[in-house]
Amino acid sequence: MTKEVRVRYAPSPTGFLHIGGARTALFNYLYAKHHNGKFIVRIEDTDIERNVEGGEASQLDNLKWLGIEYDESIDIGGPYAPYRQMERLDIYKEHAEKLLAQGAAYKCFCSSEKLEASREEQKARGVAAPTYDGTCRHLSAEEVAAKEAAGEPYTIRMRVPENVTYDFEDLVRGQVTFESKDIGDWVIVKANGIPTYNYAVVLDDHFMEISHVFRGEEHLSNTPKQMMIFDAFGWEYPRFGHMTLIINENRKKLSKRDESIIQFVTQYKDLGYLPEAMFNFFALLGWSPEGEEEIFSKEEFIKIFDEKRLSKSPSMFDKQKLTWMNNQYIKKLSLEEVVALSLPHLQKAGLLPDELSAVQHAWATDLIGLYHDQMSFGAEIVELSSLFFKDHIEYDEEAKAVLAGEQVPEVMAAFKAQLEELEEFTPDAVKAAIKAVQKATGHKGKNLFMPIRVVTTGETHGPELPNAICLIGKEKAIDRVEKFAQ
């Protein structure tokens, strides 16, 4: 590849970093780094009314958190600055005037009411996709001047060439073709002087020397409009690649209103998902490596990334796979790292104080250690460890079935007696106490362990029993046995 690879992720600050945007950014990043190229983040902020406070920061901060490092953007600058569209208005204005001068564009004075009436009339005739009817396309220079002199507001429209076929080799889906007759003259500059997306993006891509454009499938129909602008100026197209949709488990297109899936990167961060796991998961959301392996480091992904393996079929957002993958990464963490990940969630839930004594921190560390290999994300520790913070235990049907055994009263009475005699309350001491109960009662296996587990923890499954009872504490464990006996 002779020309330097330069790709871009160009979000609008109309919302926070979405999983779809994160995937787009990631594939662009991997492609650039695989080819020793540059990854640019450009902010497309011309939709002023819809821009939200914190939108820009969410995009940049969460990309950094994911480990998607960009080479040029609004915060670090670069040779093609500015990287914010509202700071590039002079460029768009200058080139719109060039398009007007060469007749490739024209001023349109049609009111929104007239345009709406035209759309409705076309729909009534059965036109599936109404287009502009061309009212102002043939205005003379004198007519245009008169309307301007009268102060009539206008937009600038692209004069769509007649009988032109726009075809290109899409890097994901192969040959794609559009016909100019299906497009209609479209607005490149709105009445307020702000450029539209399909116009501004071409100028930005050209002047920033973007070589490849990887983006979502929803942008496919924008491509012929953008090709018109490139053609009008005699500029070379970048290579285009349109990634398939992300779908939910019902195989429906992922919508931001779909509450069955957490959709924003910052939400995963807040729940205690790991950035390395999210990076790994997003990389496999519409791309597949050779072989069966699914866990890769960032460096490995950069080395093996091949755009030819981008999927042509919709990509399902598999929540269970993400949970499994995050657990694989949590297992690799040290105990200290797992504590740093999950302890704040216990504190936020009000289960532990914000300021911990050395004894409290040691207890919390042991508690979290019990669930190290089981934990799927940091916040899950609150649910996993709930048995340690309950004042009152309620037994479910499975637990009640265990406690219905004839041997249970004898086992629990013996266990209570053993607990009361313990001077040191350690896992080894509790283990010895359980063995003593076995010896005294003759009960063993599930008939011994299950009643003790259910009465002391309220659960039929859980972490290593002596360790759990030790963390519950002698006084609380005895209290739970006594309440059961009542």
Curated annotation (Swiss-Prot):
Q: Which cofactor does it need?
A: Zn(2+)
Assigned GO CC terms: cytosol
EC number(s) from the headed UniProt entry: 6.1.1.17
Which positions does the motif 'KMSKS' region occupy? 253-257
A molecular function (GO) term? tRNA binding
**Where is the motif 'HIGH' region annotated in this sequence?**
11-21
- Chief location bin: cytoplasm
Alphabetical list of CDD domains matching this protein: GluRS_core
Which amino acids does the record list as binding Zn(2+)? C108, C110, C136, H138
Where is this protein localized, as stated in its record?
Cytoplasm
Which InterPro entries does this one have? Answer: aa-tRNA-synth_I_cd-bd, aa-tRNA-synth_I_codon-bd_sub2, aa-tRNA-synth_I_CS, aa_tRNA-synth_I_cd-bd_sf, Glu-tRNA-ligase_bac/mito, Glu/Gln-tRNA-synth, Glu/Gln-tRNA-synth_Ib_cat-dom, GluQ/Sye
Q: Which positions form S-S bridges?
A: none
Q: Tell me a GO biological process for this protein.
A: glutamyl-tRNA aminoacylation
User: NCBIfam families of this UniProt entry?
Assistant: gltX_bact
Entry similarity comment = Belongs to the class-I aminoacyl-tRNA synthetase family. Glutamate--tRNA ligase type 1 subfamily.
| Protein name as annotated | Glutamate--tRNA ligase
Species:
Lysinibacillus sphaericus (strain C3-41)
